Amino acid sequence: MSNPAKSEQSAGHDVKVGKRLMGYLRPELRIFIAAILAMAVVAASEGVIPKVVNDLLDKGFGGEYAGKLWHVPAILTGVALIRGVAQFASGYLLSLISNRVLLKMRMQMFDRMLHAPAHFYHRNTAASLINAVIFEVNQVLSILTSVFITLVRDSLTVVALLIYLFYTNWRLTLIVSVILPVIGYLMSKINRRLRRLNRDHQTLTNSAAYVVEEAAGGYKVVKLHGGEAYEMNRFRNMADRLKNYSMRMAVAGGLNQPVTAFLAALALSVIITIAMIQAQGNQTTIGGFTGFVMAMLLLISPLKHLTDINQPLTRGLTAAELIFRLIDEPVEPQDGGVRLERAKGDLVFERVGFRYGEGTRPALEGIDIRVPAGEVVALVGPSGSGKTTLVNLVPRFFDPTDGRILLDGHAIGDIALRELRNQIAFVSQDVVLFNDTVAANVAYGARSEEEIDMARVERALQAAYLTEVVKNLPEGVNTNIGDNGMKLSGGQRQRLAIARAIYKDAPILILDEATSALDSESERQVQAALEALMVGRTTLVIAHRLSTIENADRIVVLDHGRVAEHGTHEELLAANGLYAGLHRIQFATH
């Protein structure tokens, strides 16, 4: 049993979403009205054709039109021309509105995505965001445009044809208005069952495809564990269910046309009988009856569209709600009135704590670290000890849940977010490059090619040991490097990311496992580039390979989100604590 309160709440929510969509149409109101007028012309033309046929049969053959051979053809041609122009105009104008709204919504979604906080990307996969911004919004507008056309054009068509029917024969129209809804109800029952069977069949087809995908993808496990019989049994069950659903669909689909034809014949028989009775009393003519039947048949299609509108309308509004949910995502807090031209780089972590969610264990707890300007501090510790979480707090990808972080004596929350991030360069093992030129990747953040300082790009490439590599590319610094730098080797991609950090020339540098995925030769080149980059910068280094951070000014060892120990490489080895244990394990392995 349905819940009336819940249904009312859902309906109210749909109205709210609909009103918000209408808000996007307000700037296009003039074009919108013009499109409605064009659709009204198309709808009115539906009622003209039965009238022309009526007059042709009653007056055209030996009647008052006999000497005017051009009359009916001229009317038909004129109606077709006007209808065609109006149809094109309505389609073009609605497409114009739809594409303008599409552009506006896409830009709003992309803007909100770019300015969303880091936890937004933890909740949403890249695939779901791509689907929403590129495909879902397009589908929503396509569905809602189609629904709008149905609501306006088909409603006006129904009105125009009903006016003609009442004008021609009001008695017969009243009888038809009783018969047609009954036929429509019976047909909707058949179609509803067919749609339900189609949905279930599609779900089963997807399940069967998944069984095939699993068996094909896991063929080694299937063969090694003798799972052929089990997989055959799984697939046989699915195939049998598919066969049964296909037969039920064949029955429902097969009944559809003959039942429709029978009901239409029954309705037509009733109408013909009544029309013949009327004809005997000179209440109708051949032309009037033919025009009436034609108008009645023309009425069926728009009525069917209007009765079927609820499903696509609901689907469109539901999808629109998901789009608005993305548009309404909160943006990163931009608070902070402190302005920094260029920071010295003095970083202080005061009793910093962080949790990823309410009720979860602390990822960081009571972190107290002072990093003087220009010092290199390495963060080491077992996986899950909080190293990456700690460095993610510096550019405010997340905000501490306890304590605070200071930059040059200012709490980072008091510094304008853009200015804070201008002070930080980041190089990670997960290199992110863009499908653009070498120069555009090095100078990433420049709004146009004119803003790129090419001399500075060349210096950055030289410092990253990439000058010779770039010279050998087809178009030098103007060579497109492909999706995520696929045209470059792993070491070259990493050095290009370092060149980007060098170009930015920020006073604070964060290195997150920057050499962990490289071979020995690439690591040597990248390490040399990193050493050049670290000179004069406050640097936080995360490293699993302890050999790469032995020369750090200080090493901080984290364990379970707390500082376990800190000191130089030699001091920590002498202390024989966690760091010394990790060091022994690594070098024993090597």
Curated annotation (Swiss-Prot):
The chain crosses the membrane at residues 31-51, 74-94, 132-152, 159-179, 259-279, 286-306. It is found in: Cell inner membrane. It comes from the Bacteria. PROSITE patterns: ABC_TM1F, ABC_TRANSPORTER_1, ABC_TRANSPORTER_2, MSBA. CDD domains: ABC_6TM_MsbA_like (cd18552). ATP binds at residues 381-388. SMART domains: AAA. The keyword Translocase applies. It is an enzyme of class 7 (translocase). Coiled coil: none annotated. Residues 347-585 form the ABC transporter domain. Its EC number is 7.5.2.6. One of its GO terms (cellular component) is plasma membrane. GO terms for molecular function: ABC-type oligopeptide transporter activity; ATP binding; ATP hydrolysis activity; ATPase-coupled lipid transmembrane transporter activity. Residues 33-315 form the ABC transmembrane type-1 domain. InterPro entries: AAA+_ATPase (IPR003593), ABC1_TM_dom (IPR011527), ABC1_TM_sf (IPR036640), ABC_transporter-like_ATP-bd (IPR003439), ABC_transporter-like_CS (IPR017871), ABC_transpr_lipidA (IPR011917), P-loop_NTPase (IPR027417), Type_1_exporter (IPR039421). Its main location: membrane. Keywords: ATP-binding, Cell inner membrane, Cell membrane, Lipid transport, Membrane, Nucleotide-binding, Translocase, Transmembrane, Transmembrane helix, Transport. It is a multi-pass membrane protein. The keyword rRNA-binding does not apply. It catalyses: ATP + H2O + lipid A-core oligosaccharideSide 1 = ADP + phosphate + lipid A-core oligosaccharideSide 2. In MsbA the ATP-binding domain (NBD) and the transmembrane domain (TMD) are fused. Belongs to the ABC transporter superfamily. Lipid exporter (TC 3.A.1.106) family. Involved in lipopolysaccharide (LPS) biosynthesis. Translocates lipid A-core from the inner to the outer leaflet of the inner membrane. Transmembrane domains (TMD) form a pore in the inner membrane and the ATP-binding domain (NBD) is responsible for energy generation. Homodimer. This is ATP-dependent lipid A-core flippase.
